[in-house]
Amino acid sequence: MNVKPKLPKGFRDFDSKTLEKREYIIKIISDVFKSYSFQKIETPSVESIETLSGKYGDEADRLIFKILNSGNYLSDYDLNNNADYKELTRFISKKALRYDLTVPLARYISQNINNISFPFKRYQIQNVWRADKPQKGRFREFMQCDADIIGSKNLINEYELVRIYDKVFEKLNLPGTIISINSRKILTAVSTKLNVEDKFSEFVNLLDKYDKIGKINFIEELKNFNISKEDSDFLIKIIENPDIDYIKSYLSEFGISSEGFDECKYIFEKLKLTSNFCEIKFNFKLARGLDYYTGTIFEVENSKVKIGALGGGGRYDNLTSIFGNNELSGVGISFGLDRIYYCLSELSLFKSSNELNKTLFLNFGERELNYNLKVLDVFRDSGISATI
């Protein structure tokens, strides 16, 4: 029987021209990482379920690609008995494809902690998998390009990671790039004022959807949190006109403070000392959904191409504690290669591709062939691409 060749939804092949453009982006990113003294590591595509589960929040946990165990593990179960399914679930899968590169990094550090010098500056460029609904710019297999600094709480690390973002997009010459900065601590302080601490995850997820659902729908959904009209008006004001000093002053009237304000201001003060290619701004409604961020959070978008985040990251103080290391604080960023590729393509910013074969030797006979074979080696040994 003939099988129709097709790919599963959300997965792709890449031809040589596409790969050449992707490798152009990867080289720029990795070169910038190296210039900031980051070391490259790699981790396996497969991690244990217990390593990944519970680190990303309930919504993200559902997107983890689980791998069925091998063997005839169904032989002892009555598949017609619904009661067996609950018992069976925990035996079906004990491994999964990695969802991101950060949690595997925490596992890697915990396993190799005695062989690592801290602060540990690592970068990693590998594929990740998410069982998400495929759409424009969103795939089930895609490459992440991460840089993390582990073992230091110094805010200069946040500054350097923002500079890495800025430097990469400058080298890519991608106009309209916006780097947004916020703090999970500021969001926590605001949620305290609004009395929604017990629904913090739901609150920040709604905040993160503000641009997508619009002001009217946002206000309507706020009613689910029993927020007063006064507090609702305050929230809309700081969403539309975010100012760190205003938010800090307002909350202080109620005895609520947060070091997140001072941390963000420190980063912006340091960024004023440099010439920045990207627009860098404070964005109160930035509330990245991953549960492990505890401090500063970042996100990168492009105003000229609407495709979502080109990158993101933040500070995570407790991630390695799940593996028994309580003192390790970390901060990291990630580049979304596919979306960056899409932006460069949409804006026609890729340089014209050089021909793969820069030198062509013609064969007019056996004598000429013998001569060409010798000269071909000379060209190739000199780094010049050639074919016959």
What residues fall within each predicted segment?
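Acidic, His- and aromatic-enriched active-site or binding-groove loops in soluble protein domains
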Residues: 60-76, 195-222, 302-303
